Amino acid sequence: MNIRPLHDRVVVRRVEEKKTTSSGLIIPDSATEKPSEGVVVAVGNGKKNDNGDTIALDVTIGNKVLFAQYAGTEIKVDGKKLLIMKEGDIVAVIK
């Protein structure tokens, strides 16, 4: 992937939602919400504090994360839809 976010920004790939129910019914795209779960694919160097020191991010590449439903900006890199957001928009890391 040819993208490196700046400062405290993170690039996330959304996980795919299931398109069928447990009984086999197909759910149309218009009836589903965008998932608020994803995998971190790139991270910035960190945020600078008042002294100019860089504070490292808590998330790393490969972390599975939860984020606010409308967080981030959707971008397209190498034909893939990704989200770029600030680390503060991530609400949890899934272990």
UniProtKB/Swiss-Prot annotation:
Q: Which Gene3D superfamilies match?
A: GroES chaperonin
Any idea where this protein resides?
A: Cytoplasm
Keyword line: Chaperone, Cytoplasm
Q: Which GO terms describe its cellular component?
A: cytoplasm
User: Carries keyword Magnesium?
Assistant: no
Domain of life, per UniProt, equals Bacteria
Q: Does the keyword Chaperone apply?
A: yes
BP term (GO), one = chaperone cofactor-dependent protein refolding
The GO molecular function terms of this record are: ATP binding; metal ion binding; protein folding chaperone; protein-folding chaperone binding; unfolded protein binding
Cross-referenced InterPro entries? Chaperonin_GroES, Chaperonin_GroES_sf, Chaprnonin_Cpn10_CS, GroES-like_sf
Q: What does this protein do?
A: Together with the chaperonin GroEL, plays an essential role in assisting protein folding. The GroEL-GroES system forms a nano-cage that allows encapsulation of the non-native substrate proteins and provides a physical environment optimized to promote and accelerate protein folding. GroES binds to the apical surface of the GroEL ring, thereby capping the opening of the GroEL channel.
> What binding partners and quaternary form does the record give?
Heptamer of 7 subunits arranged in a ring. Interacts with the chaperonin GroEL.
Task: State the family it belongs to.
Answer: Belongs to the GroES chaperonin family.
**NCBIfam families assigned:** PRK00364.1-2 (NF001527), PRK00364.2-2 (NF001531), PRK00364.2-4 (NF001533)
Q: What is this protein called?
A: Co-chaperonin GroES
What organism is recorded for this protein? Vesicomyosocius okutanii subsp. Calyptogena okutanii (strain HA)
Gene symbol here is groES
